């Protein structure tokens, strides 16, 4: 039996996952243009997911990618809640442990790449361990 593709209930529209993947790829390419090197995408851990992991010089950068059509409800950057920050921190901690590292031994930061309409905003060090 054939499977119904995601988003098939909305002909001509992408599923949420397809839309997210497209914006994450756009963010990755944009950041590579800024000199960052790609390490991994869509890294899962206990209840959380890191959209992109990249390297900026010697710094490991955990990146959350957000998109909003408009800033009517606060824009993309405002959508990274404290709860979301905690999930990202937990997932980063697990990823570092899997790679024989920790927040104490590896220089890292948490960035947000926010697309609001056609605007892009790169928030370096958007939050940290004390979130």
Curated annotation (Swiss-Prot):
InterPro entries: Restrct_endonuc-II-like, tRNA_endonuc-like_dom_sf, UPF0102_YraN-like
GO MF: nucleic acid binding
Annotated Pfam families: UPF0102 (PF02021)
Chain positions covered by the region annotation Disordered: 1-20
Cited Gene3D superfamilies: 3.40.1350.10
Homology family: Belongs to the UPF0102 family.
Protein name: UPF0102 protein Ent638_3585
Organism phylogeny: Bacteria, Pseudomonadati, Pseudomonadota, Gammaproteobacteria, Enterobacterales
